[in-house]
Curated annotation (Swiss-Prot):
Gene3D superfamilies attached to this UniProt entry: 2.40.50.100
Protein family (similarity comment): Belongs to the GcvH family.
Quaternary structure annotation from Swiss-Prot or TrEMBL: The glycine cleavage system is composed of four proteins: P, T, L and H.
Function per UniProt: The glycine cleavage system catalyzes the degradation of glycine. The H protein shuttles the methylamine group of glycine from the P protein to the T protein.
Keywords: Lipoyl
A Pfam family per the record: GCV_H
Taxonomic lineage: Bacteria, Pseudomonadati, Bacteroidota, Flavobacteriia, Flavobacteriales
Protein name: Glycine cleavage system H protein
Record-linked SUPFAM superfamilies: Single hybrid motif
Annotated source species: Christiangramia forsetii (strain DSM 17595 / CGMCC 1.15422 / KT0803) (Gramella forsetii)
Name of the gene encoding the protein in the UniProt record: gcvH
Length: 126
């Protein structure tokens, strides 16, 4: 299982890449493996400001539909529109072309609540 050291993680199996006050968010390799083949990603919250732990979208796989939660508060400034036609990118490259949203961070102190790669490995038993 791939858990890049440079990223931060949540117990909801999302990864967070921090670049100044812009944060890129996606689901982890573990999550995409548990979900199975992803057939649809829906994000209807573009340009909205959401609080930490609010639902920003859903991911639909062959066997289930799961909510996607904000790991930190912020304004959703970009959605990976390529996922509309190629949702399988989440399975194939969850940390690269399978990213889901970018947000403008509202509260940098919330970053302290995210997990390191080693802490996330403990969550998934890796």
């Amino acid at each position: 299982m791939n858990i890049p050291q440079e990223l931060k993680y949540t117990k909801d199996h999302e990864w967070v890449k921090i670049d100044g006050d812009t944060v890129t968010i996606g689901v982890t390799d573990f999550a995409q493996g548990e979900l199975g083949d992803i057939v649809y990603v829906e994000v209807e919250t573009l340009d909205e400001t959401l609080d930490k732990e609010e639902v920003f979208g859903t991911v639909e796989a062959v066997k289930t539909v799961s909510d996607l939660y904000m790991p930190v508060s912020g304004e959703i400034i970009e959605f990976n529109e390529s996922l509309e036609d190629e949702p399988e990118k989440v399975n194939e490259d969850p940390y690269g072309e399978g990213w889901m949203i970018k947000i403008k961070l509202s509260d940098t102190s919330e970053l302290e609540d995210l997990l390191s790669a080693d802490e996330y490995k403990e969550v998934v038993g890796s």
